Amino acid sequence: DKAFLYVGEGNVLAACNALVHEQDRRLKVPESEREMPVLFNEYCTTWGCPSEENIRAILQAIRSFGIGYFVIDCGWYKPDDKGWGNATGDWQQSATLFPHGIKAVADAIRAEGMVPGIWFEFEVAGRDSQAFSREELLLKRDGALITSKNRRFFDLRKPEVDAYISERMIDFLTENGFGYIKIDYNDTYGIGCDGAESLGEGGRQVADESLAWLDKLKAALPDIVIENCSSGGSRIEPKRMGMVSMCSFSDAHECAEIPFVAANVSRVIPARQSQIWAVLREKDTPSRTVYSLCAAMMGRICLS
């Protein structure tokens, strides 16, 4: 890997523009990304409870919009008696939410001319998952499991973790016909972990394995579109951004400050990679609707 430096006269914005231009020049994306299609993500419609029923209704409503990607966000795996946030890690589709299987929904999305996408947070196990108690798969520090309130972290360096994630994520994507993955990451294991000469080196190794999974995804599914999320824009850095198609710019869904956030993000990633929420509500005034759509035009439009 190489570090890129910029030296020149001018201000910080000029330096940022030069570095972003270099990132854009080096970017390699799937063929489906050439025309930078508009997305629809159902999160701000279902708020973590997607289902076959509500997705089919959404597909009917957006049929005429010319959307390229339809992303099923978090919650598709949640148990009947638990919330989505602490159920990450097992990655078993809900038979209640998807009685005909999630592949039937992915097929319905493709039948409407869109690439089906789905949300994963594959590096963590939530408290309500079985994986949360599988000590042999999880990171430790000073011999104790690293627990961040309701989450633990897979030790991505272990072959058995590699096999587990391959089965639960890559096989799932392949078998169900998904062409897009939204990778989220909403926590941190802190200063590092056991298993190396220092805690920091352990943490670095795990971070490297996280990046290696992007290559594994592309090797298994060469046309896969990868969205880098992480609580919105918490993993916006050149190495990772050079390995993905785009990035959720922020978890700012509906606030009036979206253009300011988007403008600042444009200093560090190319506009073609900056996915900006445009959440439209029936109660919105015409001026609010125009504002939401125009704000998203500072990058990639993600409707909800």
Language-model segments: which ranges?
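Short Pro-Gly-centered flexible turn/kink motifs
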Residues: 1-11
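Acidic carboxylate-rich catalytic motifs and surrounding loops in phosphoryl-/glycosyl-chemistry enzymes
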Residues: 7, 120-121, 228-232
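N-terminal carbohydrate-binding accessory modules
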Residues: 10-31
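Short conserved micro-motifs at the rims of enzyme active sites and ligand-binding pockets
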Residues: 12-16, 49-52, 280
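Aromatic-lined carbohydrate-binding/catalytic grooves of carbohydrate-active enzymes
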Residues: 31-170, 176, 180, 190-191
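Active-site neighborhood of glycoside hydrolase catalytic domains
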Residues: 94-101, 105-111, 133-290, 298-300
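C-terminal catalytic subdomain
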Residues: 295
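A glycine-rich beta-turn/hairpin centered on an aromatic-Pro dipeptide
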Residues: 304
